Amino acid sequence: MIIDCHTHLNNYHDETQHSLTEDLARLQLMMRRHRIDAALVLTSYKIVPGRPSARAVVEATSHLPNINVVAGISWATFDAAQVSELRSLLEARAIKGLKLYPGYEPFYPADPKLTPAYLLAEEFDVPVMIHTGDTYAPNGKVKFAHPLHVDEVAVDFPRVKFLICHLGNPWFRDCMEVVYKNENVYTDISGLTLGQFTDRFEAYMRQQLKEMILWGVNPNKVLYGTDWPLASMESYLDFMEELKLPPRDKALMLFENAAALFKLELQPRRGGLESLLSRW
């Protein structure tokens, strides 16, 4: 099986706006084409045309057991009403986690304003995904997105599981340290490139990921994700193939880690992980 733990249904990167139904159909098509068994859809930190709310995505995907939702949180507008909405979604088991976007918004993860979000994550035992590293938007402020800032909330909220998105790119070693040091911190490999990997960049990223595992980061703390549609599913599967990891590590990264962290109960798509593993 293969789980893509990091996808979006936003289409702000396209010149033409699409409906949520169209974007969802496109995601399903890509999943079938590339034999992806399940995906987590991360909603945005703001609700505008092209960026549907968590509840809208939950309703649109309610009939699709292989697509689950992670609710994006806006630091700028986070208030009691948002806490109530998140609680409602969590009580209904409609979302599998929360997502913060430091860098896209000017805040640090340890901002006390976000304490209610972390307490919700602790109460319902769902992970908090945190954007780190480079921002797709040129007006982002990357000082807020350094992976070292995740260490503070990981220490202050030891019963909450945190996921550092994008390996902290370009601060890979800092990401390694935070994941290695904190039992409750994980990372994903999503969003390392836009579109396709170039040969030189793919070789560089392979080295970074292998170094992370050799450095002491347990493979059961690294999750497979793409950041689709900004990144190519096909390119990412090729990247995984070129890593040439041991079969056990591949299985952990491609499926088992995400299934455990997000508590996913899924039926495998025929020809998913087994087919991919057969390529190596």
Stretches with model-predicted labels:
Residues 45-46, 75, 102-104, 134-136, ...:
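Active-site-proximal loop/turn and secondary-structure-junction residues that shape catalytic pockets
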Residues 1-8, 19-38, 217-223, 232-280:
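Mid-to-C-terminal alpha-helical segments outside catalytic/metal-binding sites
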Residues 25-48, 66-74, 96-97, 162:
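Divalent metal-dependent hydrolysis catalytic cores, especially in the metallo-beta-lactamase
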Residues 6, 31, 57, 98, ...:
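Conserved, mostly hydrophobic/aromatic
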Residues 9-22, 135-137, 196-198:
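Acidic/histidine-rich helix-loop elements
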Residues 93-97, 110-223, 276-279:
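Catalytic pocket-lining loop regions of alpha/beta-barrel enzymes
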Residues 48-144:
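Active-site gating/metal-coordination segments in enzymes
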Residues 6-12, 131, 166:
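Histidine-centered divalent metal-coordination motifs
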